[in-house]
Amino acid sequence: MDQFAHISAHDAHQKLAAGAARLVDIRDPQSFETAHAVGAFHLTNGTLVRFMNEVDFDTPVIVMCYHGNSSQGAAQYLLQQGYDEVYSLDGGFEAWRREFPIQAGDA
């Protein structure tokens, strides 16, 4: 995959439920702590190395932001770091929260 792909909240949820991907949330710490998708990894400059050490490069990664815009740059960056399959979640957290479970606090 040379470029990230777009994925709907529904398709992302199916991949995650099947254990076929990891979800990362790139929103600011306060927004993440207030509410985030269940099981999301809070990806920041400070947690990037840990994520890369924990998640194999052949594991599909789904990137979530607020509305689906910022996630595109982050998705492309993860591809450049060596991840094979990266998706930007269309509609971001706002699309996710309309359909699927969210939680508060640190994940």
UniProtKB/Swiss-Prot annotation:
Catalytic EC class = transferase
Q: Which reactions is this enzyme annotated as catalysing?
A: thiosulfate + hydrogen cyanide = thiocyanate + sulfite + 2 H(+); thiosulfate + [thioredoxin]-dithiol = [thioredoxin]-disulfide + hydrogen sulfide + sulfite + 2 H(+)
Which residues does UniProt mark as catalytic?
C65 (cysteine persulfide intermediate)
Q: Name one GO biological process term.
A: glycerol metabolic process
Q: Which domain of life is it from?
A: Bacteria
Task: Give one GO term, molecular function aspect.
Answer: thiosulfate-cyanide sulfurtransferase activity
Localisation? Cytoplasm
Q: Which Enzyme Commission number(s) are listed? A: 2.8.1.1
- For this UniProt record, give its keywords in alphabetical order, as a comma-separated list: Cytoplasm, Transferase
Any Gene Ontology CC annotation:
cytoplasm
Question: What InterPro entries does the database record attribute to this sequence?
Answer: GlpE_sulfurtransferase (IPR050229), Rhodanese-like_dom (IPR001763), Rhodanese-like_dom_sf (IPR036873), Thiosulf_sulfurTrfase (IPR023695)
Q: Provide the function of this protein.
A: Transferase that catalyzes the transfer of sulfur from thiosulfate to thiophilic acceptors such as cyanide or dithiols. May function in a CysM-independent thiosulfate assimilation pathway by catalyzing the conversion of thiosulfate to sulfite, which can then be used for L-cysteine biosynthesis.
Full protein name: Thiosulfate sulfurtransferase GlpE
